[in-house]
Amino acid sequence: MKFELDTTQGRARRGRLVFERGTVETPAFMPVGTYGTVKGMTPEEVRATGADILLGNTFHLWLRPGEEIMRKHGDLHDFMNWQRPILTDSGGFQVFSLGDIRKITEEGVHFRSPINGEKIFLDPEKSMQIQNSLGSDVVMIFDECTPYPATEDEARKSMQMSLRWAQRSRDEFDKLENPNSLFGIIQGGVYEDLRDESLKGLVDIGFDGYAVGGLAVGEPKADMHRILEHTCPQIPTDKPRYLMGVGKPEDLVEGVRRGVDMFDCVMPTRNARNGHLFTTEGVIKIRNARHRDDTSPLDDKCDCYTCKNYSRAYLYHLDRCNEILGARLNTIHNLRYYQKLMEGLRGAIETGTLDAFVEEFYTSQGREVPEVPELTD
């Protein structure tokens, strides 16, 4: 992987990630394909929304279908028929989410399979081996997602163990002679000094990119912004910056303003299945009876397949009848909305009009533009 940085406006960055399997324009949003599929979508449909790269879930693909079946197909690209870049998470966050059915030690994590209750052990070495089998273009280190709330001492111990796991991940990745890219994950909770220590340790080890982890786990939005404002400028300029698991459209806008290059989140697809649809004027709840006889499209500024062909009334009807097509059309729209937002952000950075773009983004929804500190490096 090669990261090319074209231009900046404030801290916002316009560039691209160049892989053998294709180029990813940044800032970029990655749809989530947890089980080797973006729910309800074919790869061709996902690509048509403007997606250049997908996120796969190491933990779930390891449990089902497993490495052996994956290898029989070649790798995850062949298994799901997506011949473009794929980033896989390490499984650390999913283990974190298991709560009481897992036990974290220095060696790794012991837990019971959420599928059949089988006892399973996952450590940095195994995570690297699984992601190698998946053929991931971007491999994430195995780390512990620091919970919120956590005391500074708790966050320090978690972060320092994640640093030791980062070294083990790097060593195993190199041992496997994996030709792809490995990203480090900055931890430290809401404590700036711990974020500094984490980043320094990761840079000393050396990675192809750096993710900001452990955010969007329940902390106030102001804390997330503060950590991004503090941490992003310290990440090496020539490396991509990835904010994991984020988020709402406004979170992407605010992340880009603070120097983030990559995002992923289940929100556009999950919300689509629940009838919550993103538009330039705000969120539409298609289950609301007000849409029952509305012949207008979801968003007259959207160029997606759904908006060009179907009315709000039809989408309301599909939802009321629990038709699968409704969830699919909603997903197409939400994913296109996210990709169009990223296209707009990229174009605004290129032309030096980011401030005007951000103002239009908020005012078109009847919202005030959030103030941002003077973001100069």
From Swiss-Prot:
UniProt-listed GO biological process terms: queuosine biosynthetic process; tRNA wobble guanine modification; tRNA-guanine transglycosylation
Name the coenzymes or cofactors required: Zn(2+)
**Record field: catalytic activity:** 7-aminomethyl-7-carbaguanine + guanosine(34) in tRNA = 7-aminomethyl-7-carbaguanosine(34) in tRNA + guanine
Region RNA binding: list its residue ranges: 245-251, 269-273
Q: Which Pfam families match?
A: TGT (PF01702)
Per the entry, the cofactor note is: Binds 1 zinc ion per subunit.
Q: Which GO terms describe its molecular function?
A: metal ion binding; tRNA-guanosine(34) queuine transglycosylase activity
Write down the SUPFAM superfamilies for this protein, in alphabetical order.
tRNA-guanine transglycosylase
Q: In which pathway does it act?
A: tRNA modification; tRNA-queuosine biosynthesis
**Which residues does the record give as Zn(2+) binding sites?**
C302, C304, C307, H333
Q: Provide the active-site residues from the annotation.
A: D89 (proton acceptor), D264 (nucleophile)
Highest taxon listed in the record's lineage: Bacteria
This protein's UniProt keywords: Glycosyltransferase, Metal-binding, Queuosine biosynthesis, Transferase, tRNA processing, Zinc
E.C. numbers: 2.4.2.29
Binding, substrate: D89, S90, G91, G92, F93, D143, Q187, G214
A GO CC annotation recorded here is: cytosol
Which family does the record assign? Belongs to the queuine tRNA-ribosyltransferase family.
Under the subunit heading, UniProt states: Homodimer. Within each dimer, one monomer is responsible for RNA recognition and catalysis, while the other monomer binds to the replacement base PreQ1.
Role, per record: Catalyzes the base-exchange of a guanine (G) residue with the queuine precursor 7-aminomethyl-7-deazaguanine (PreQ1) at position 34 (anticodon wobble position) in tRNAs with GU(N) anticodons (tRNA-Asp, -Asn, -His and -Tyr). Catalysis occurs through a double-displacement mechanism. The nucleophile active site attacks the C1' of nucleotide 34 to detach the guanine base from the RNA, forming a covalent enzyme-RNA intermediate. The proton acceptor active site deprotonates the incoming PreQ1, allowing a nucleophilic attack on the C1' of the ribose to form the product.
Q: What HAMAP family does the annotation carry?
A: Q_tRNA_Tgt
Matching NCBIfam families: Q_tRNA_tgt, tgt_general
Name this protein carries in UniProt: Queuine tRNA-ribosyltransferase
Organism classification:
Bacteria, Pseudomonadati, Pseudomonadota, Gammaproteobacteria, Alteromonadales
